[in-house]
Amino acid sequence: MLPCINPYGYAHDTRENRAGIDINRSFAGDSTHESDLARELLAGESFDLLVDLHEDWEHAGYYLWEGAPDGEPGIGAEIVSRIEAIGPIYSDAALDGYPISGGIISAEEAERDYRRKGVMSLLTYGLRELAEHGITSETPTQWKLEDRVRAQLAVLEVSLSHYAV
């Protein structure tokens, strides 16, 4: 468990670190101290599921990114179903240029785009190096903290219900 990869960003409500670099796009090529440390801590590990919990200050509805093994339905829809009881789900057809349906964006779509840009997020890095299945959960900072925590706990509960041994 990596509790907070970007403490500066968390404290200052920004996705960039102190140097102004987006850590969650620095897992390939131009790395940061934070992404280097995360890769070092995760090196050689293998997981059934990678879960990355985020907050989004730009959008009012919950959404997630999911990469699942070929032919498997994933758990994103179940997660979104649980979170609908907590707050609104992002409902537009696209988010930041990525197609989104039912609050779920395909991590494979991001992977193709990031490869063109020479960047990689923790999720796309994790799907390539660490796990066959991955989720990045995005709770809106516009929600009350209590609701954001409840939503992220729901993500973990659903995840554990599918992967607990």
Task: Provide a role label for each language-model segment.
Residues 1-165:
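Structured catalytic-domain cores with a bias toward divalent-metal coordination
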